[in-house]
Every structure is written in C-alpha cells, then in structure tokens.
Amino acid sequence: MSARVALDPLEAGVFGWFQWPPGRGRANAGVIVDPDGITLVDTLMTPEQWAPFAGEVEEIGLPVRRTVLTSSSVEFAGGTGRFKLAAIYGSAQASLHLDQPPNLESWQALYPEQAEGFAEVETRPVSHVVTSDVQLTPSTAVLTTGGQMSENLVALVEGAHMLFAGAMCSFGVTPLCWQGDPAGWADELDRLAELAPIIVPGHGPIGGVEDLRDQQAYLRACVAARGDPSTLPPGPWDLWADREHDVINVERAEMLAHGDSGIPPSMLRLAGLA
C-alpha cells in the first residue's frame, strides 16, 4: 500500500504529489496553478491514489482546466476520469493507446497491490494531441520527447526552474522500458538535462541533473549488456527499487538492436500474458 501523501508546495503555485515508497505502481503527479485554473501533470492510477489527490486539488479553489499526460500508462493516466472537465493533452501514441479497451488482467498482474481498484478506473481519451512544443499556459510549456515510449511529453515551468518529467525520469526506481528505446531514451535525457535544474520525476523523489545522469548511465548499461542482464556493472542502481525491470530493459535494447520492435517476452511474463 502507498503511504499517506499530501500536496507538497514546491514553488509559488506549483505543487508535487509524491507517493511512498517509490516504485512501480506508485507514480508522482504535478499541480500548476495559473490565473484561469489548474494544470495537472499526470493523474495517478486507482481511486486509492487519485481520490485523495483530487480532494487536495479541489481545496485550491480553482477549476482543473488541463491535464498533461507524460505517458499513456495507467500509472499516469488512470485518474483522468476523475477530472471530467479538464482538457487532456497527450502525444499521438498516448491518444492511440487510450482509445483502446483496457487490459484489466495485465494491470492486475503488474500492480497487484492495487488490483481491486482497477474496476473503478475509467480513463478518458486524449482531447488535444501534442505533436510539437507548445506554450500551454503563461507558466507552463509542454515539450515533446520520447524514450519511455516512442512519444512522451514533459511540462516545463520555466519561472520555477522546474521540469515535470513524468514517465521520462525515474529516480531511485529502476525505469521500465518495454515499449520505448533504452538507447534513444538515454540520448533524449541530454536534452532534458538542459531544461531546468529541478526535476520532478514520474517515480521517486524530486531531484536534479545528477539523478538524471544516473538514470542515463543505467539505460546505456542496459544497451551495452547485449542481452545479458547479468553483465550489468555496479552503479547507483544497486540501491534502486524494482530491479526486476533489468531483464526487460536489457532484452528490449537487444531486440531493437536486431530490428525487432516487439514486446519483450520478459515483459509479457511480468504482465501475466505468457
């Protein structure tokens, strides 16, 4: 179970929602306040997570106008149905995924602690497909990127020197790259490193460029492993949660190196599909 959390003020009009202990199934979210209303960055997963989050967001006293999805994964998009009047901004890939019927059995296999809550999860489709960088509000720019999936989004609050990286960053938690490109993800982190010194990841505590570089080194080590996770060298990741993701990340990198963009068999096993 996730520990009780609350909105964490990060800067004037900017809040984070950090789930503890960090790990798969316990993603973060962001709240950015503009004069016309609120922009959310991701919406958490099941009612146990998004109900208290929504309650605290409502206490701000402004309408939720916009939701930016950094990924289509249910960890980030599961609460979209709770914010029924918000416009949903996502990538074309996220839009495609969210138009498909949910796979409850896989969700329950991947996130067993939240298995009972998925019966109440109704994701909303993307209403605004983002294909290029855009200044969404006076405070927030939405930038296109990719790596965790082929197409991800991040939200930059330049005035707060803060990047809501969502699914693109995972600090203290092993990233999971079964539908993206570990090598391309590592390269794209170079661009994100230049955007802001403060980074709010999709999993784990708030961090900075040093944490991003640790993640980058891990992803490059997965590529260099050439399909054998036992050859991963020691590093900061030795202390990370969810090291069962290693085999998936290494397998995905090796499959892509040989022109195979299919789902890694190790991911199918984790999701209860093999």
Model-derived features with residue positions:
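Hydrophobic/aromatic beta-strand patches that form the interior of the parallel beta-sheet core
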Residues: 15, 68, 89, 128, ...
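Active-site metal-binding motif and surrounding structural segment of the metallo-beta-lactamase
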Residues: 47-90, 195-196
